[in-house]
Amino acid sequence: MKIIVRILILAEFAAIVFIPAAYLPRWALIPMFASMIGLVVLYWFAMFWVSRKDVEKVLGKAPEHDFYVGKLPADPSADLTRGRLCVTDGRLVLMQRTDDGERRQTPCREAWSRNVDEVTSVGFGKVLPARTGFILYYGDDEVRFTCAKAAKDKTIVYNALGWPVPETSEGN
């Protein structure tokens, strides 16, 4: 599916860029751009989206709390690890989408995990120059996640960790 979507995006881009304006009417450009944006969104879902149903299939039960995040890597030149952060049985587990060949057997895999008890504190704010999220602190270590939903409503992170929501916290 990803290959087909890539080819369609490339073909549509080539049509818009390389077909002379005399042969391509203006009214056709807007639907072409709209369908290209739709194809890019479809490609993103095919590459990164992990549904709650996929997580239930792999873990064998529904997670207590879950939300879609991007985990920042330790190496700044690497890409985000995108997936669904789940809290189940006292563990934080980041489930990442598997490749197409493996998807029928296991739609997602565990990319990162940690015990909830190890979290010493939580911080909210900008984790990248253009992205908000939250930071989980483990003593001297920290793990950063991008998640606009969690940055806006901090209670979901506190509830997921099983902590009381502070009165001074914004977004209650």
Go through each PLM region and give its residues.
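Phosphoinositide-binding peripheral membrane targeting modules
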Residues: D75-R84, T88-F134
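Disordered regulatory linkers adjacent to lipid/PI-binding modules
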Residues: G171-N172
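Canonical phosphoinositide-binding patch of PH/PH-like domains
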Residues: I135-N159
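Eukaryotic phosphoinositide-binding membrane-targeting regions
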Residues: Y43, H65-P76, A151-T168
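A general alpha-helical scaffold signature found inside nucleotide-binding enzyme cores
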Residues: G60-E64, R114, K152
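Generic detection of short hydrophobic beta-strand segments and adjacent strand-loop junctions
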Residues: H65-L72, W112-R114, V143-F145
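Eukaryote-biased RCC1-like beta-propeller repeat architecture
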Residues: I19-A21, R109
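Anionic N-terminal interaction surfaces
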Residues: M1-R6, F13-I16, P25-G90
